[in-house]
């Protein structure tokens, strides 16, 4: 099925379109269809697994080819993570392709910036980058640098720097989303997604982010942990023995373990995570570094540290592209079936956005003051601040001076969220 859903599409599962906006029970689980409107997963057959695998392979081909052409980059992780980003972008992530800055959009944060070829390739399928721009990967002045730089209009929510920082971006965004939903109800009801990796899990900054997310019960936060067990020069087991699942469970997270290269398992985990109403969710996806890669002699190049941070090179690259169904002579290609898959999602998003904007219009009519405030919050305009009212005492500690300023701002800037740790 392609394009927007019709009323008849919902009758096959016993739902009249009028009951669509009311909670229903499916498999003994109460589902709010309005909340699940983003992906139709409870109302429609999913994309064929063969097609989903083809799309993931297309992403792998593009990612490996970007690194090969640049003679620099990280192909292995991007190839292993292709299945998750494909399911997310082709079935779950809600955004307005015609208005990427729409305030109610879902957010996707990529922590391991070195896996940028995966993100750029997926965004190319979604129409945000051209194939020629993918060919410019890591070139001076190109829109596809080695680590992504924030560009909302192209679907990039964050600049990816040190590993672990993406955890904090996502948690902060989830807190902000809760803040906004408390004030603007159904028009700010987005999900925050994050993609993290073994390297980010090892960084201490991710620990604090994980703890506060669990403590706050951020059920609007879903993190996919790409657990390929490979790092720059060794397997992760050589440097760590901790149980990541138990650690996050101790912090108050829901943890789901899956095969991270299985589209059906990914979809099921995302549905389960979206239904969670009390805790953030960590999906531990056990993936294969360099999924589909082949060596020069044709043997498997998967789960090999050598694919982490260097081009596949020579015959290994040629054999890999052939193994994935591509043409080494013309690798920067989108398969027709994959183009259709993403065109279908674009049509779905158009229908979703029509509904979202209708809800917003009705809400704004009923809540004009709140609607004006929402517009102001996203206008980029700074409020008037009475700096003269801030009185500092002599010889106070910098943390005390900072607290004085923040306290003054908190009473004058409505959309500021601030918390301080004890040091």
List where the protein language model places each region:
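N-terminal capping segment at the start of a domain
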Residues: 56-72, 225-228
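Cofactor-binding active-site loop characterized by glycine-rich and histidine/acidic residues
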Residues: 80-216, 415-419, 423
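Cationic, amphipathic, low-complexity segments that mediate targeting or membrane/lipid association
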Residues: 1-5, 9
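Non-catalytic terminal/interface segments that mediate subunit docking, oligomerization
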Residues: 360-423
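Glycine-rich ThDP/TPP pyrophosphate-binding loop and its adjacent helix/strand module
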Residues: 97-98, 152-153, 158-342
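Short, positively charged and aromatic/hydrophobic N-terminal segments
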Residues: 10, 20-25, 34-42
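A short glycine/serine-rich beta->alpha loop
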Residues: 49-52, 66-75, 103-111, 153-164, ...
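N-terminal leader/propeptide and maturation segments of large enzyme subunits in energy/redox metabolism
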Residues: 325-388
């Amino acid at each position: 099925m392609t394009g927007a859903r019709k009323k008849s599409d919902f009758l096959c599962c016993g739902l009249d379109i009028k009951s669509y906006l009311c909670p229903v029970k499916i498999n003994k689980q109460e589902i709010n269809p309005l909340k699940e409107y983003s992906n139709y997963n409870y109302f429609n057959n999913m994309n064929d697994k063969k097609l989903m695998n083809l799309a993931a392979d297309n992403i792998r081909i593009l990612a490996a080819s970007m690194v090969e052409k640049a003679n620099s980059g990280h192909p292995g992780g991007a190839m292993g993570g292709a299945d998750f980003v494909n399911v997310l972008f082709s079935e779950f992530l809600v955004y307005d392709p015609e208005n990427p800055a729409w305030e109610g959009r879902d957010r996707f944060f990529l922590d391991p910036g070195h896996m940028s070829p995966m993100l750029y390739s997926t965004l190319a399928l979604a129409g945000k980058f051209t194939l020629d721009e993918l060919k410019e990967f890591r070139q001076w002045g190109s829109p596809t640098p080695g680590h992504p730089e924030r560009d909302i209009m192209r679907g990039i929510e964050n600049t990816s720097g040190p590993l672990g920082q993406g955890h904090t971006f996502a948690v902060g965004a989830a807190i902000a989303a809760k803040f906004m939903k408390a004030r603007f109800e159904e028009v700010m009801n987005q999900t925050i997604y994050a993609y993290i990796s073994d390297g980010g899990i090892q960084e201490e900054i991710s620990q604090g982010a994980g703890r506060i997310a669990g403590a706050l019960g951020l059920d609007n936060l879903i993190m996919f942990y790409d657990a390929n067990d490979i790092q720059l020069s060794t397997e992760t087991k050589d440097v760590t023995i901790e149980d990541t699942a138990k650690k996050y469970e101790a912090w108050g997270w829901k943890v789901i373990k899956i095969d991270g290269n299985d589209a059906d398992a990914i979809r099921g985990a995302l549905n389960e995570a979206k239904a969670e109403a009390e805790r953030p969710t960590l999906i531990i996806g056990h993936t294969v570094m360099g999924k589909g890669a082949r060596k020069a002699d044709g043997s498997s190049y998967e789960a090999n540290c050598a694919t982490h941070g260097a081009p596949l090179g020579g015959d290994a690259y040629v054999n890999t592209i052939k193994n994935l169904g591509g043409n080494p002579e013309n690798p920067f290609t989108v398969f027709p079936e994959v183009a259709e898959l993403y065109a279908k999602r674009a049509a779905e998003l158009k229908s979703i956005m029509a509904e979202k904007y209708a809800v917003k219009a009705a809400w704004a009519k009923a809540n004009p003051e709140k609607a004006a405030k929402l517009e102001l919050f996203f206008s980029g305009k700074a409020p008037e601040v009475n700096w003269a009212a801030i009185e500092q005492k002599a010889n106070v500690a910098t943390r005390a001076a900072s607290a004085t300023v923040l306290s003054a701002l908190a009473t004058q800037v409505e959309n500021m969220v601030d918390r301080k740790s004890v040091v």
